[in-house]
A protein has these predicted regions:
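Sec-dependent N-terminal signal peptides
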Residues: 4-13
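Short S/T/G- and acidic-enriched coil/turn segments that sit immediately N-terminal to beta-strands
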Residues: 568-574
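Non-catalytic C-terminal accessory/binding modules of secreted extracellular proteins
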Residues: 166-181, 185-186, 193, 219, ...
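Extracellular fibronectin type III
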Residues: 593-608
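Conserved aromatic anchor
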Residues: 537-548
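Active-site-proximal segment of zinc-dependent metalloprotease catalytic domains
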Residues: 102-369, 399-402, 414, 435-436, ...
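C-terminal outer-membrane/trafficking sorting elements
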Residues: 550-563, 578-583, 587-589, 608-670
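N-terminal prosegments of processed precursors
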Residues: 18-126
């Protein structure tokens, strides 16, 4: 078998490996000395460990006891001499040793980075079939000792991956449903379920860790699965894009994944760009995910949700991780707000969180509008809706246009949980090719490159957060925070230039739509109580003054035709200039330099001096033609000659024979 597997050469062309973050489960461990210690799962696809409540790294020693990690100058990271204990149970010697030798999670950054190397994920979507309807192979594999436990495994996974409106396992959609929804129908993959394939060795052979280094025989596991699938008759060429390249093969393995369990010999779910050669073509990448998830609240193993697969498949499509890949616990990243962070685990992974606006544009599934430096009223429709939209606010101090803020609208829907609240989500992005390529987007606590600006000013990690903490992230949300500037709390805090020099105000939410004023102190109120009154022998249009208004724009319409526009400084206008419009409509708009214009207030009335629109002409008559203000333009025009008059005008016609007064609107006879 070993010789056979070697035929499926694993080529290391720009090899990268990216994975799901550890599900930060707490376990209560009994130690050999009779004590118990509470630990939290940590690590990634390369390194697996546990963390104490005060962030010291712990792994198992050869006898199965949990010990603190220290860094030996010869062996590197290894187990120390002390068993791990909760803070209050530590001896004096143990505390002294920890202060000198103990390794905190943030301190393994160098080792984790060395193992990751350059990840190869892209600064933009990789062009890996983000459009169209590709056929994706999914090979079901089990070990010699760990078999699939779900009933009707092939049929179950056929529905899990492909069923429309899938509700199995407590979900709200299949894997295909998820990507069809995020792409708004632009990407509609079909997953070809293959297997079950039984591997030659037991699970621990493929998934065992070397110290705290993960899955020492994973490549062999994938190559063996591919070889056995091909030997059983699978033609990989049907998955090719036409040039002999098979973009990806997916593996679902029996049992749990190490990232979401305490099974240290289980395989950690991950995506890799390692290349595998088959008779049917060259496989460019693979991803592996697990069958089962341990539901601790009900103490049962159940079919894992689609979240982990959707996360890993999103790596295949080009997205990096937005969690801290070095496992520092003081970095928020995007937490539950993104599937590329902890959002893959929402509802135990059964209902993963939908794509952010950034992720949708990254794929080419959404175009985000850029707000220029002019005041305006903006409306943001919900992500996932037919009319979804989002906005950029650029940092003009950055000539590369790499730093910006994204404003998107989160509303409860299939892929956006009600528990997280609703409103405007503001993200701060500082793109760096190196950070994206190395999969280190949010590894620097002082310079997170993809995170949110919370309305309540508090970023609370998922293992400590209450629902109100997430609801408090949104504007106006439960905090009723309606503005954001360089001087508010929270404030725009760009990394370049010190200040942004832009601001938004009057953030509101109504019927699922978020509105705000950009580069304005607010929106002026609509003028009220419009009326036509007699004043000093003249007809006057009047209205209540609007607070903060500096001028008013009055538009006069004849039907749908704009007759004239007049700016006034007071809350009234003389109507003698209306002329001969019979049924004028007035629209009044309040204006001010630092505010968005008010909505238009409207009133209509019948002008006793006006004339009716012409309804037809007498071919034997001639007309004198006047402007609406009464200026004579020409005399003795026959009816058919009136067609030569310029459009977009209103003319008064006086008949030579009947001396009647009529008019033409926009050069068209009504």
């Amino acid at each position: 078998m070993r010789k056979t597997i070697l035929l499926f050469l694993v080529l290391l062309y720009n090899v990268s490996m990216v994975a799901s973050p550890a599900l930060r489960i707490k376990i209560l461990v009994s130690q050999p000395d009779g004590t118990k210690v509470t630990l939290v799962k940590g690590g990634d696809e390369h390194i697996s460990y546990y963390i104490t409540s005060d962030n010291y790294v712990v792994i198992k020693n050869a006898s199965g006891a949990y010990c603190y990690v220290w860094q030996d100058t010869v062996s590197g990271f290894t187990t120390g001499k002390f068993l791990a204990h909760d803070v209050n149970d530590r001896s004096r010697d143990e505390r002294v040793w920890l202060e000198r030798y103990g390794v905190r999670a943030a301190e393994i950054t160098v080792e984790a980075k060395r193992l990751r190397g350059r990840q190869g994920v892209s600064s933009r979507s990789l062009g890996r079939d983000q459009f169209g309807s590709p056929l994706i192979p999914v090979i079901l594999v089990q070990y010699s000792d760990i078999k699939f436990t779900v009933d009707n495994v092939t049929a179950t996974y056929q529905d899990y991956f492909n069923a429309e409106n899938y509700t199995g396992n407590g979900g709200r959609g299949s894997v295909r449903d998820y990507f069809v929804s995020q792409s708004m129908g632009k990407y509609t993959p079909t997953f070809d379920i293959v297997g079950v394939i039984t591997l030659s060795n037991n699970r621990s052979y493929y998934g065992q860790n070397d110290g705290f280094y993960n899955d020492v025989h994973l490549d062999e596991m994938v190559s063996e699965a591919v070889e056995k699938a091909e030997s059983s008759g699978l033609d990989f060429s049907k998955y090719s894009n036409g040039d002999g390249r098979i973009p990806v093969v997916s593996i679902v393995y029996a049992g749990v994944g190490e990232q979401s369990s305490d099974e240290e010999n289980a395989v950690w779910a991950k995506f890799s760009s390692r290349t595998i050669i088959t008779k049917g073509g060259t496989i460019s990448s693979y991803l592996v995910t697990n069958e089962l998830f341990y539901n601790s609240s009900e103490s049962v193993y159940e079919l894992d949700g689609i979240g982990v697969f959707c996360h890993e498949f999103s790596h295949f499509l080009g997205l990096p991780d937005f969690y801290n890949t070095n496992e520092s616990t003081d970095i928020f990243g995007l937490s539950f707000w993104s599937i590329m962070d902890y959002g893959q685990y929402w509802a135990n992974g059964k209902i993963p969180v939908g794509y952010t606006a950034y992720e949708r544009e990254f794929m080419g599934w959404l175009s985000i509008d850029t707000l220029e430096t002019k005041k305006q009223l903006c409306h943001v429709n919900a992500l996932g809706s037919e009319s979804q939209n989002a906005y950029y606010i650029l940092n003009d101090n950055d000539d590369t246009r790499s730093e910006y803020y994204i404003l998107e609208n989160r509303q409860p829907s299939t892929w956006f949980p009600k528990t997280l609240g609703s409103g405007l989500l503001i993200m701060h992005v500082d793109y760096s090719y190196g950070a994206w390529a190395d999969n280190e987007v949010n590894n620097d606590a002082a310079h997170q490159r993809m995170t949110i600006i919370p309305a309540d000013g508090k970023l609370v990690k998922e293992n400590q957060a209450m629902p109100s903490d997430y609801q408090g992230d949104l504007f106006p949300g439960i905090t009723e925070n309606t503005s954001m500037s360089d001087y508010t709390t929270p404030a725009f805090a760009p990394y370049r230039g010190g200040s942004l020099g832009k601001y938004i105000t009057s953030i509101s939410e109504s019927n699922g739509v978020v509105s705000f004023c950009y580069m304005a102190d607010g929106i002026l109120e609509k003028p009220e109580n419009l009326s036509i009154q007699n004043k000093d022998g003249s007809r006057v249009l009047m209205w209540n003054p609007v607070e903060e208004a500096e001028t008013y724009c009055v538009e006069v319409y004849d039907g749908e035709t704009l007759v004239k526009t007049q700016d006034v400084s007071y809350n009234f206008m003389d109507l003698t200039t209306v002329g001969l419009v019979k049924h004028p409509t007035f629209k009044v708009i309040a204006k001010a330099a630092r505010y968005v214009d008010s909505p238009a207030a409207e009133i209509s009335f019948e002008n006793p001096l006006g004339v009716e629109n012409i309804t037809g002409g007498n071919g034997g008559e001639e007309y004198d033609v006047y402007t609406i203000e009464g200026v004579l333009l020409c005399k003795d025009k026959a009816w058919d000659e009136l067609e030569d008059l310029p459009n977009d005008k209103i003319y008064i016609l006086r008949s030579k024979k009947s001396n009647t007064v009529k008019k033409i609107v926009n050069g068209q006879y009504e």
